[in-house]
């Protein structure tokens, strides 16, 4: 990693607003460590600004997106849903001046699947024919990847997968230049000198655990960004973050990194008009393990659903900034439709427990890992008190995370609460993850419903999107209402506060903190 003197960017950081006229200053609590998206699963700001993808997921409104052409100006899908043909834009250049070719695309995806790379997000490509053999070291290339000519890429899948285009719009599918990346070797993405993309910004400086400086790409194929520079600072402390923002040394304040500041900014006469908010396409939920008594009885599961006052948790723990969710798909996800509301009714829940053979109540375990943040413990304590009214005598058990994950992997953990955010905009990201035959076990739901398994597998290959959405909506009712397989809690809003000179700042469709700053302007 190239380490610059701390003073190297200090003068830029402390610039007056006038001097920093065309520079946007943002912050994140951790250093990304690399710009190589194949080597990270949770730091996407550099990849989203330095690289492009064949297809992009463009925000069209709060919690809304559309798949639009990226490096591929158009594409076709064969009638059987197996072959995707992408036609690349002519004349797209990498930051070093090299012209994008089909070979770069094939190389990028092959590099991800090459076991020597040890990439962390190979799952987005495993539907490609030959991908698993490449990952397993049984092949030297991927049979389903082909450069037809200089501007045409053909990708063949092992089976139809309706979400494949959405996967290609995820950050992990960023495209690299073969010659540059091979020359950089294992240093690729670690320094400005070893980073090269086609994106709207060029990585110019990188001070480990301090900051990254990006400059506008004058030759960007979509047109030069409005910003001249993008300064990304690493700020670990929430009080320091607020001080920097209110002293005009940062242009954007991400309330996800300082949630206790939410009442202040929403109530401040100075700042409340500068709040920008959008839904996070994700869901807090409570797991129910049907392999363990008393939750093998659907009446007990329904009672548990009805005994949790979700609105109170949202209000107490998250200042009410969100929306109750009642299904499997959170708002903003493709195919989303409002599900049947889950009633909060501890009296009826108590009756259901009695019907199930527990007239005097029943003991249950709520599990959490020792290194999880305080919010999970806070939520469990609230839920422990709430469900007691219905007759659930909940014991909160804290275990080592490794032990918890090992037990969950074989379907043996106790009930727990967690959150899942959309990696890509397709229902499969939720349904397959939690309720497929493999997913329901490794996440310890054990909702062994063959009708659900068959429907999820069918939906993955459907090409009629309207019919596919209808199937997912019917599945929601089956999973949440009929099987009572989990407790959907709520989705949150993601709020930012921006300086008044910041224009065209839009919360990404998925509500992530990581975003492209291509369209943002400063006055």
Give the predicted meaning of each segment.
Residues 73-121, 154, 241-244, 294:
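Aromatic- and charge-enriched surface segment that lines or borders ligand/interaction sites
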